Regions:
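Bacterial N-terminal signal peptides that target proteins for export
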Residues: 1-3
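C-terminal motif of bacterial Sec signal peptides marking the signal peptidase cleavage site
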Residues: 11-13
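Active-site-adjacent loop/helix surface patches within enzyme catalytic domains
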Residues: 18-37, 42-152
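Second-shell loop/turn segments in exported
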Residues: 32, 57, 96-99, 120-131, ...
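Acidic, His- and aromatic-enriched active-site or binding-groove loops in soluble protein domains
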Residues: 36, 70-71, 170-193
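Extracytoplasmic/secreted proteins, especially bacterial periplasmic and envelope-associated proteins
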Residues: 64-65, 74, 131-142, 172, ...
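Acidic/histidine-rich, metal-coordinating catalytic segments
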Residues: 149-164
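Short acidic, glycine/serine/threonine-rich helix-capping segments at coil-helix boundaries
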Residues: 197-261
Length: 265
């Protein structure tokens, strides 16, 4: 008797999603849904706006540039959804991550109201509020779960466009988010072991750094003539994983963190 009941239940479910007449005037039957599908979203890209709340909203809603979400600042930050996740927002520009290019088509962009650098030398930065980060963490967890996004694919604009972008900056709390299971981070014990090894063996050459950076997702060209490009990529990497010093120079701690991340699955 169970089979007829299941059959009736299935037919009832189908009858709820029968033919629909859309605005264009033709009929679409949505009774069946294919199992062979997944989300178009592979990446989450984080930005700061460099503007106040009012200007951020105006720029992101009245111009070509846009983002899926905008998180304001103040005592009670507001999370706005400006673009549906199923549609493309124009936030990433020329970009690359793990060989994927022009990430607008496959990412969710999140803009956070924050001034970024407070001086021309970019040595002073505005911090993010704890309330902003609490809201952001909840959003990131939800997005990552719904779209099945790998931790390594939650990135900053500077990670995917290191030659021209520096947001979300060195004060963005990547490590604190990683402790909540959001994003990629390194193992400190292994990094200390790698540091001891490099103190004994010496620092690897520029080709080693280029290869490891490419291995963990960054776009960087091989060759001794690409030192300035490599320096900017290293600076983006350091802002993300070693924000206490982000001069773009290769050093033992940077090498140790790179080595650990490159060994992660």
């Amino acid at each position: 008797m169970a089979l007829p009941v299941a059959g009736c239940a299935l037919l009832a479910a189908c009858s709820r999603s029968g033919p629909e007449i859309n605005d264009a005037g033709y009929e679409v039957n949505t009774a069946y849904v294919a199992t062979g599908q997944d989300s178009r979203v592979r990446f989450i890209v984080l930005h700061y706006t460099s503007e106040n709340n009012e200007d951020s909203l105006r720029i992101l809603t009245k111009n070509r540039v846009s983002s899926h979400y905008l998180l304001t600042d103040g005592q009670e930050p507001v999370l706005y959804r400006l673009v549906d996740e199923n549609r493309r927002a124009w936030h990433a520009g020329s970009s690359q991550w793990y060989g994927y290019k022009n990430l607008n088509a496959m990412s969710v962009g999140i803009e956070i109201v924050n001034k970024g650098p407070l001086n021309p030398e970019k040595t002073l930065w505005e911090s993010y509020s704890s309330r902003q980060i609490d809201i952001l963490a909840a959003l990131l967890k939800d997005l990552a779960q719904r779209h099945r996004i790998h931790p390594r694919n939650i990135v900053g604009h500077s990670d995917i466009a290191p030659q021209r972008k520096i947001d979300p900056g060195p004060l963005f709390p990547w490590e604190a988010l990683a402790r909540q299971g959001i994003g990629r981070w390194y193992n400190k014990n292994r990094v200390r072991q790698h540091e001891a090894m490099f103190r004994s063996t010496g620092l690897p050459d520029i080709f080693w750094f280029q290869e490891k950076l490419r291995h963990i997702g960054y776009e960087v060209a091989f060759g001794a003539n690409n030192e300035e490009q490599t320096r900017k990529v290293l600076q983006a990497f350091q802002m993300h994983y070693r924000p206490q010093r982000y001069d773009g120079e290769p050093d033992i701690q940077t090498a140790a963190i790179l080595m650990d991340l490159a060994g992660q699955p």
